[in-house]
Amino acid sequence: MQILLVSTIKRRVGIDATASRSRIIYEIASGLVKNGHEVSLIGTADSSVDNVRTIPIIDKGFAELSGFENRFYAETSYLVKLCKKVEEIGSDFDVIHNHTYPELINLFASERIKTPMITTLHAQATSEYDEALSLFPNANLVSISNAHRSMFKKAKIQNVVYNGIDTQAFSFESKKDDYLLWIGRLGATKDENNNFVDAKGAKWAIKLAQATGERLVISGNVEDEEFYEKEVKPNLNDKIQWIGPISREQRLQREEIIKLMQKAKAFLMTINWEEPFGLVMVEAMSCGTPVIGFDRGAVSELVVEGKTGYVVPPSDGVEGLRKALGKISDIDPNDCRKHAENNFSVEKMVENYEKLYRKLIEKM
């Protein structure tokens, strides 16, 4: 098949991409090429996937650029250029797979070309976004978990395809060191009630470490330096450590993250929001590391209670996390690995998307 992947202008796509959306696009593109398809990618000029043709809209990720007179208009203008490019060249392909941020921008183009388009929704299902998507009842929308799908009350979501990871890269390690691991985006964001919250839950991980005396390793990208300075840095000591750059766009290299995941005795998913998937949980389990997470978003869907980790009611707070941690030695790392291999591999993800591509093409 001739397949067009429509990426985001916000960040580049590559093996070293830090954002989950960009990493998934990279894995899909690589997997499709491996299966013999011809793949093109619309996105940033510095995106790089072996044997994939890049069609540039912007030199590099918009998140890295500055100096615009009006940042909103600048980003919107690039999105319009991207949408027009999809409309111009879309008919040259058998199928289009849309991942743009925001995803709905290319739904306008899909109504004006004959080539079928699949749109994978990566974003949180806010009420405004849900309503906007519902204006395209014929769009082929895919969510990334059943929990994610259930968040949309108006939009018609036809299919669910789990994200996949390179299980060979996130390889198995049975021997663990004595530390807990938290990796995520640091920063306060507004919730549905317009209150600022620590969405990824770094503060919960710190509270657990303080309550138990456990060693905690924290890493990720710092989107809000003030949050890091106020909420994280004052708590750092010989037991609670930050590893990696203090940067919005940079974090540890993938190989370094894998090593941390392989040796951690537990990965903490202490989120304060309804996360649609949670790629880091799957990566940790692939390394044989169990997950302890709050029952929000897709956590209970991805983690098998008592077998690959523990799911804690958010209302139980630190005490619930502590109880789960006390049972962590009951988890067999081999079960974590098997669960990741059987359900969340790149091969499985690509196979599921190929089935959807063929199904759409047959309908034409």
Locations of the language-model features?
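Catalytic cores of nucleotide-sugar-dependent glycosyltransferases that transfer UDP/GDP/TDP-activated
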Residues: 1-364
